[in-house]
């Protein structure tokens, strides 16, 4: 890689790192300190934002500090970086499940997603990656032979690939397709009901509009976040597959592209919250002290 390319990559990585930290930090601030954002759905957003915040804070800085091979230790990498990448994956899956329940079983949502269950689910989404990151310590500092340690790493890498790589890439698209089909069916049923009301009671619809915008924005958000994740993590999963089944190190261009996409994913999620969640957009505009009504109109025109 030429000098100018390396310089550009480093600068671009730092820009994405700063964007991920600032953007997710702002999301964390809004959910914690804005009472109107204290809802069950936003707790999952908060948990994902915390994971993405630490992805931004650790991913590239660790690469720069431990660029040389003697500094790099796989178990330290898991404790410092991969734990937050895995937490980002588990929290995204959890948020998808939450939206799936809200759309598939809207009448039972409040009884299913109680405060206790929500907190337990968020704790599980963090505890599983933490336990995973601690597992390598059990053989790294043990008296087992180097051959057994190598086998342990192979099994561990394969298992984490299945849990945090393959499974989300199968589960998330299926969940999104199911959500979109249900939303489409509900919109068709709503249109049929409104058409019947228009036919039976002229003028009623003008006075009593159904407002599906909240449901639509919620659906758009989860679809956008999941699609962004799938696009940005496909290189990372491919690199992990190559490390498990291949015998050659992936090209440097693939590794650079993978790291850039991972940071883009963490930096883009706050943008999606601000543009597609009306409550976030409203509180963000208040925080930035922008006139709410005029700014809302401007953003709606852009969207």
Residue spans for each PLM region:
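Helix-boundary and loop/linker segments of multi-pass membrane transporters
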Residues: 1-6, 33-38, 110-114, 149-155, ...
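Extracellular TM2-ECL1-early TM3 structural module of rhodopsin-like
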Residues: 2-18, 40-112, 154
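Helix-to-loop junction signature of class
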Residues: 13-17, 30, 54-69, 81, ...
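Alpha-helical transmembrane segments of multi-pass membrane proteins
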Residues: 17-20, 46-56, 86, 117-134, ...
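Transmembrane helix-loop junctions in multipass membrane proteins, especially transporters and channels
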Residues: 32-36, 64-72, 107-110, 137-145, ...
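Intracellular effector-coupling site of seven-transmembrane GPCRs
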Residues: 50-51, 181-236
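Fourth transmembrane helix
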Residues: 65, 84-94, 101, 105-148, ...
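Seventh transmembrane helix
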Residues: 168-175, 220, 225, 230-241, ...
């Amino acid at each position: 890689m030429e000098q100018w390319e390396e310089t550009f990559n480093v600068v671009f990585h730092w820009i994405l790192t700063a964007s991920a930290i600032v953007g997710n930090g702002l999301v964390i601030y809004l959910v914690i300190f804005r009472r109107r954002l204290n809802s069950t759905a936003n707790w999952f957003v908060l948990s994902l934002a915390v994971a993405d915040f630490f992805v931004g804070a650790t991913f590239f800085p660790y690469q720069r500090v431990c660029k040389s091979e003697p500094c790099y230790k796989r178990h330290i990498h898991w404790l410092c970086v991969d734990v937050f990448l895995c937490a980002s994956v588990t929290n995204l899956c959890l948020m998808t499940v939450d939206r799936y329940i809200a759309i598939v079983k809207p009448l039972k949502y409040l009884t299913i997603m109680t405060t206790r269950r929500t907190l337990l689910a968020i704790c599980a989404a963090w505890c599983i990656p933490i336990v995973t990151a601690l597992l390598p310590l059990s053989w790294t500092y043990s008296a087992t032979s180097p051959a057994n340690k190598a086998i342990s790493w192979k099994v561990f890498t394969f298992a984490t690939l299945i849990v945090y790589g393959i499974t989300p890439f199968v589960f998330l698209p299926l969940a999104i397709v199911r959500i979109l089909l249900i939303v489409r069916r509900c919109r068709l049923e709503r249109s049929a009901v409104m058409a019947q009301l228009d036919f039976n009671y002229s003028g009623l619809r003008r006075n009593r509009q159904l407002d599906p915008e909240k449901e639509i924005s919620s659906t758009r958000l989860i679809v956008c976040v999941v699609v962004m994740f799938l696009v940005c993590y496909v290189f990372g999963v491919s690199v992990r597959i190559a490390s498990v089944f291949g015998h050659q190190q992936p090209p440097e261009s693939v590794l650079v592209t993978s790291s850039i996409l991972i940071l883009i994913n963490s930096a883009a999620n706050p943008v999606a919250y601000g543009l597609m969640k009306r409550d976030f957009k409203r509180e963000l505009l208040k925080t930035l002290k922008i006139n709410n009504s005029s700014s809302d109109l401007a953003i709606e025109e852009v969207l």
